Amino acid sequence: MRLLREASKLGPRLLQYNGVTRNKPLSLAFCRHCSSGIVPNERIRNIGISAHIDSGKTTLTERVLYYTGRIAHMHEVKGKDGVGAVMDSMELERQRGITIQSAATYTMWKDTNINIIDTPGHVDFTIEVERALRVLDGAVLVLCAVGGVQCQTMTVNRQMKRYNVPFLTFINKLDRMGSNPSRAVLQLRSKLNHNAAFIQIPIGVESKFKGIIDLVEERAMYFDGEFGQSVRYDDIPAEFRAEATDRRQELIESVANSDEILGEMFLEEKIPTVADLKPAIRRATLKRLFTPVLVGSALKNKGVQPLLDAVLEYLPNPSEVQNFAILNHENSEETSRILMKSDRDSSQPFVGLAFKLEAGRFGQLTYVRVYQGMLRKSDYIYNTRTGKKVRVQRLVCLHADIMEDIEEAYAGDICALFGIDCASGDTFTSKSNDNLSMESIHVPDPVISVSMKPTNKNDLDKFSKGISRFTREDPTFRVHYEVESKETIVSGMGELHLEIYAQRMEREYACPCVMGKPKVAFRETISNTAPFDFTHKKQSGGAGQYGKVIGFLEPLEPESYTKVEFEDKTVGTNVPKQFVPAVERGFREACEKGPLTGHKISGLRFVLEDGAHHMVDSNEISFIRAGEGALKQAMEKSTVCILEPIMSVEIVAPSEFQGPVIAGINRRHGVIVGQDGSDGYFTLYADVPLNDMFGYASELRSCTEGKGEYTMDYSRYQPCLPSTQEELINKYLEATGQLPAKKGKVKG
């Protein structure tokens, strides 16, 4: 303790301890345990910082680490010193000024341990946000005061809803020209359907932004000192008192609508005290019935400390979040959900989820969220998917790319293991007979593909090593070899996603790559129900092959266009039950290549109603072939159409360029779904086929004199235009040397 007291006097200067020079202050930020033992759940928060690209997430995280004593000096994302933010540890991130991988850290604020994951804002890296939100208890949604709710904000909102994550909203960049926090809150309500209200309002905006008003405590807050590190409280300025009173009343009404206790006080016309209001905000936020809105400017060092206070006051600790594991019963397809116990001791068996893999300097690094029990260094744990027993050789907690060894981790902790062979989404337990798995991470399907090959044929070994590592790390990065064209095809979430992997291949494996033209992940489907009655027979002397299947194919609803489903409606033993999985396997294998253009078949259901088998000749391979043949037969009887991915596109540009921008979207077969305008700028929302979006960045720069910008996010699949379908079929026929007359019929 004496050492810590002396260290605190030194502040951010270099410290020497046991002969080691540190460039960070020795502070309680490094302390994960209190004097009585283990940090209780009440003093732990696991949060993520998520937002649309360029909303200021990484800058905000940098300020959080500085004010909590975790780092000694702040650096900007694109600062003149060229150092870059601490959380952007990858060289490509510092070079481009964007976050590519989610980065984890932890810090202390008012004796509470806060684990933070800073996530990317670009739609191409959406899997990083997906798996971060899967393992976090709460989140901070950052909005730009100028842009408000944007494309990726909507995606993050859907992800938070999927995993039931409570969150605060922080409206950032109030110092920017055109900032309008009130508009951002209205968009939270109208676009995202949240019961949102200010718990703080700014004292001025743009160049007049001086501080914030706390509506709960009814006081003004100013941030003094060179880096805003000193918070000064004062009375609310006279010119803002009326607005503060109105906004506080609006806050009380919003919370009263979602909290029973405050609602009763509101009906009885009682004025709630701070002691009444804070617990009510917390209760409503934890149930996702209310969204507290805070304001500030991370770049100008204003509003960050009150945000940290709000994380402690309004976001849940691990014991307040229910996490379930799926128990698979032996000899049965039935499953049951088991509630994980968040006690921070060794009384319960260990259960953890590997949510992210990364190749570090010392081998594979596996990020794990501990959901139950305790994990010690040197413990043996079991991978429930593979059944393999592995030893925890090294246990670390992470601060961006800096690792700190720890001896143990408890329920509620986020840590990392070395040397563990696993895949993203695997569950680990301390018992070998546990047939448990944590509820899985949603992995979106890739929407774009390109061919990739090393520039030098001698680098094939390096290329295959890099591809192997990247596919293990990122479930949205897929690779397959195309036999017809003899090319390696990589698929991902967008052009930037695949471009980053090509650059990483050169930087990390010294293997420069050549990329082909992007290819869109089209799908094929049917537009009407079609029956099948297919018999597979093969006689070659001795035991032959025989399998007969009867049923029908039917199209799925548009929201299920990326799925294929199988339904067994057989009664009796005409198709023995042991052969039904073989029929499904044959059907799914045949869905890999459609009849029109060779793209995957999806958006349909295979319903098996009846069939026949032979006592001697029927076997598994017979019914696999029968399943394949049944699909082909039914598709020949049905009308086949091609599906294409549609992107939600958001374009922001000066108002004088509105005409050319709209004309450009119309040329690309886009459908305009909405429009906003303010302060000389307009925002256009449109649904555009991904196939028509290639090269749009340069067109937008050209028609707006470099002043326009756009973002896009995957929305859905829908049938493409007849002209597009005809063009795709002709290209496929040319590539395969077939004649159009031999092809299946075309829709429309």
UniProtKB/Swiss-Prot annotation:
Subcellular location as annotated: Mitochondrion
Keywords annotated in UniProt: Elongation factor, GTP-binding, Hydrolase, Mitochondrion, Nucleotide-binding, Protein biosynthesis, Transit peptide
Metabolic or biological pathway: Protein biosynthesis; polypeptide chain elongation
InterPro entries for the chain: EFG_II, EFG_III, EFG_III/V, EFG_IV, EFG_V, EFG_V-like, EFTu-like_2, G_TR_CS
A Pfam family the protein falls into: EFG_III
GO biological process: mitochondrial translational elongation
Domain tr-type G span(s) in chain numbering: 42-319
GO annotations of cellular component type: mitochondrion
Name of the top EC class for this enzyme: hydrolase
Transit peptide region: 1-33
Catalytic activity: GTP + H2O = GDP + phosphate + H(+)
Protein EC: 3.6.5.-
Domain of life: Eukaryota
Positions of GTP binding: 51-58, 118-122, 172-175
Recorded GO MF terms: GTP binding; GTPase activity; translation elongation factor activity
Function of the protein: Mitochondrial GTPase that catalyzes the GTP-dependent ribosomal translocation step during translation elongation. During this step, the ribosome changes from the pre-translocational (PRE) to the post-translocational (POST) state as the newly formed A-site-bound peptidyl-tRNA and P-site-bound deacylated tRNA move to the P and E sites, respectively. Catalyzes the coordinated movement of the two tRNA molecules, the mRNA and conformational changes in the ribosome. Does not mediate the disassembly of ribosomes from messenger RNA at the termination of mitochondrial protein biosynthesis.
Protein family per UniProt: Belongs to the TRAFAC class translation factor GTPase superfamily. Classic translation factor GTPase family. EF-G/EF-2 subfamily.
Name the record gives this protein: Elongation factor G, mitochondrial
Organism of derivation: Xenopus laevis (African clawed frog)
